[in-house]
A protein has these predicted regions:
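Charged docking surfaces used in two-component/phosphorelay signaling
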Residues: 283-455
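Intrinsic low-complexity, disordered N-terminal segments enriched in polar/charged/small residues
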Residues: 13-15
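Short, Lys/Arg-enriched N-terminal segments with co-localized hydrophobic residues
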Residues: 72-96
Length: 455
């Protein structure tokens, strides 16, 4: 399956090797490292090396060219054990990336609008098609949204006159114009499940913000910093769908982002039980204060379906890939309460946790401070430099002050202290429409692109 390079002379200017399919480069004889390479005829790659050395890899006319170039790079892209993982540089060290044409399904809703803001100047993704319901089809995007634009930042003029197509009946038109789609549709679950599979079977990869496929066994539900290894299930999903390119990958529920990333680095201490109460912003319901007046001076102690998602989804995220499926973890035991509160953006979580091996407070803080995920190692465009941030102040984190930490992509924590019933308790906060929705989906798409799943 693989051709092999045993070694190469680090002092040489260039080496060329004919390749077929994938390529395994084993450079350990020179004390450099090892890594995978995926064949391409259109763009250069960088093969990440362990010993602070960059090797630029370019494929042209079925030739692999390896250059031993300068060592003045700050990051490397290869992560051992995770297959094909790339960041892209030219021989001068400038980051480059193939441009992908993307569609947004559900572009007129609040999350869809957030996608449009995030993708305006994205370095990799170019929006070429907007899709929504038949009510919006045939209208310009500006006409379809009307007075329901939910943000203070105005709609970008380059999207205003784009004509919206029907997400269900114009699928073939979408397939001709995009490399993959984001999906943020408000639709009955069984219909949405069928819609996303139909797109995948049209050979259009789907990055979904929706819940319809979160518990489909061969569909990865990914928080990019936490369980990128679940992407390994995609080939099995393609086999089931009988596709070559098409697949579905989903992000988890917005409520999870305020506590699961904070619990994840603590798994090494053996988490036994978790109790969490989430205080969720109205934008999570697609509402503003104008469209949800009943929330003013009020707290609503029920959000349909949220508690079940908050208790079950983490177990899939912490599960294992076995025989082409993701088998959910059986622990920890999680119990959740979810409340709607009069906050525009930002989900807060009060978290209580019991451990098999109780750590010290210093060990927990150290685990948070030192944790970095694959998006940080790959320097993905939407990845925050500091994924988890702890506030020492007693009155932090606060939604109004801290939801935009890391451009809304960081998860913040505070008030870590021992508890009289559980071992520890703390407060977590995440931005529900950035990290928790569109931003998390864009980051997932960046991860998929960097790993070659859209090739």
């Amino acid at each position: 399956m693989y051709d092999t390079i045993d070694s190469f002379n680090r002092g040489a200017e260039e080496h060329q090797y004919p390749i077929v399919g994938r390529f395994w480069a084993d450079l350990r004889e020179n004390g450099i490292g090892k890594g995978y390479l995926r064949r391409s005829v259109t763009r250069p790659f960088t093969l990440g090396i362990r010993e602070n050395t960059r090797v630029t890899v370019t494929v042209r006319d079925a030739l692999l060219r390896i250059f031993d170039i300068s060592q003045n790079f700050t990051r490397f892209c290869f992560q051992d054990g995770h297959g094909t993982v790339f960041s892209y540089f030219n021989t001068k060290g400038d980051r480059i990336m193939k441009q992908f044409n993307v569609g947004v399904i559900g572009a007129t809703g609040m999350v869809g609008q957030r996608f449009m803001l995030l993708l305006e100047n994205h370095p990799w993704f170019n929006v070429t098609v907007l899709a929504a319901s038949s009510r919006s089809a045939g209208k310009t995007y500006k006409e379809a949204v009307g007075n329901k634009w939910a943000f203070d930042v105005p709609m970008h003029e380059k999207y205003a006159d784009m004509v919206v197509i029907d997400a269900e009946s114009d699928m073939a038109q979408m397939a001709k114009k995009v490399d993959f789609v984001f999906c943020a549709v408000n639709m009955e679950k069984s219909k949405l499940r069928a819609l996303e599979e139909a797109y995948a079977k049209m050979e259009i990869p789907v990055v979904s913000n929706n819940s319809a496929h979160r518990f489909t066994a061969d569909v990865p539900m990914v928080i990019p910093e936490v369980n990128d290894q679940h992407l390994k299930v995609i080939p099995a999903q393609k086999e089931r769908l009988k596709t070559k390119r098409g697949f579905i990958a989903v992000k988890s529920n917005c409520s999870l982002q305020s506590y699961v990333p904070l619990l994840h680095p603590l798994q090494k201490f053996g988490i036994k039980e978790v109790a969490v109460c989430t205080y969720q912003a109205i934008s999570g319901a697609g509402k503003t204060f104008d469209t949800m007046p009943e929330i003013l001076d009020n707290v609503i102690p029920y959000i349909g379906g949220e508690e079940e998602k908050s208790e079950k989804e983490p177990l899939k995220i912490w599960g294992e890939v076995k025989n082409g499926e993701i088998v959910p973890a059986t622990s920890p035991a999680i119990t959740a309460q979810c409340l709607r509160v009069p906050v525009s953006d930002g989900h807060t979580a009060a978290v209580f946790v019991r451990f098999e091996n109780k750590p010290t407070k210093a060990e927990i803080l150290s685990a948070w401070a030192e944790f970095k995920g694959v998006p940080q190692e790959l320097d993905l465009p939407s990845a925050p430099t500091q994924f988890l941030k702890y506030f020492e102040e007693d009155n932090r984190p606060q939604a109004k002050l801290d939801r935009m930490e890391g451009n809304g992509m960081s998860v913040t924590a505070g008030r870590l202290r021992e508890d009289s019933v559980y071992d520890y308790k703390f407060i977590g906060l995440s931005h529900n429409t950035l990290r928790g929705a569109a931003g998390g989906a864009v980051l997932l798409a960046e991860l998929l692109a960097a790993k070659g799943y859209f090739d």
